[in-house]
Amino acid sequence: MVLNFHHSCAHNNTFKQKVFHLLIASALFLSCQAAIAQQVYTLKFATLMPTGTAWSKLMDDWVKEIEEKSNGRIKVKMYSGGVMGDEPDVLRKIRKGQLHGGLFTGYGIGRIYSPARVLEMPFLFKSVDESDHVREQIMPDIEAGFRKNGFELLGWPEVGFIHFFSTKRITSIDDIRNLRIWLWQGDPLGEAFFKAAEVDPIPLSIMDVYTQLSAKHGSIDTVYTSTFGAIALQWYSKLKYATHIPLTNAIGGVIVSNRFYNKLPADLQQLLKTTGKKMGDDIRLNAREENRKSIGLLEKNGIEFMFDWDEVDMEEMLKIRDDAATYLEQTDYIPASMFNKTKKMLTEYRNRPENQSNKKLDMAPPE
């Protein structure tokens, strides 16, 4: 009986030890899960867009949505109005880990994945319907290109239709060649277009444009931007004229670094992707509306829209576009394969019966 008693005690002790170890392991697991759930990730995000604009309000809504839906696990520090510098400066800070993301124009996008800028090639698309169609088709390629180069693409907003704005009248392409036109410093797409057009532009950071327009003997008298951008950046107050038919429909991107994105738990990654896409879509639709409204506001403030390209001008512009495309292909900034893919998509889209009536190239902002 004694032997049986000791055997029973030993068995009970072993069982108690197993239960004890299991409880300890469970407690550790739960505490680790709680720590993960409570970890706060701070997203430092920068944009050139000034505060108080329609875009900045949409970004503020995005920040609020992220922080609420993450239950405070993501906090966003927003740096608006170019306080972190021009887009190349912001990208350098992201790569160094000082920032984590930003809202960029095509200029900044080109420094991450340049083939995406086929979407803002001058005079390539006849309408936003065409650019929307092609964008949807090549978006998987663009997202993969961003990811390969260290970034996650969250959303795809739109800057909108780009016009020349000047202190001088513009009535011909020759007039354009005689202007002191700003070039966003370091922009290969702008460089290629102006080279093909035989224009000698003045390269400046976007941060210096307003100063030079304001100066009595400033280095530039002409810029290019959207109608909404001319107001948001206050450039319109120093200008008098604008071209009616725009050059292109400029793109934008909402991005975060893979370094930041990959640290997030899966649910927070999905939250960023879902809300970022929605913000990009909201800004794109808002930009189209704001650009339409801005035409009237600019006219009320003394901006005269002029120069509806005639057929000869348009043929020359298309030749300039093709020459610029050749330069960009030679440097592999936008590879020939991307141009060919885009042109094939456009041809197929234009050949649809419902699109046969849209034969004329008309990049005027939609009514």
What are these model-predicted stretches?
Residues M1-F5, Q212-A215:
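Short regulatory "switch" loops immediately downstream of catalytic or recognition motifs
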Residues V2-L23:
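Bacterial N-terminal signal peptides that target proteins for export
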Residues H21-S31:
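Bacterial N-terminal signal peptides
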Residues S31-C32, S70:
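Short linear Ser/Thr-Pro motifs
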Residues Q33-A37:
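Sec/Tat signal peptide C-region and signal peptidase I cleavage site
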Residues Q38-E130, F146-E367:
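N-terminal secretory/targeting leader peptides
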Residues D129-E143:
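A gly/proline- and charged-residue-enriched helix-loop-helix capping module
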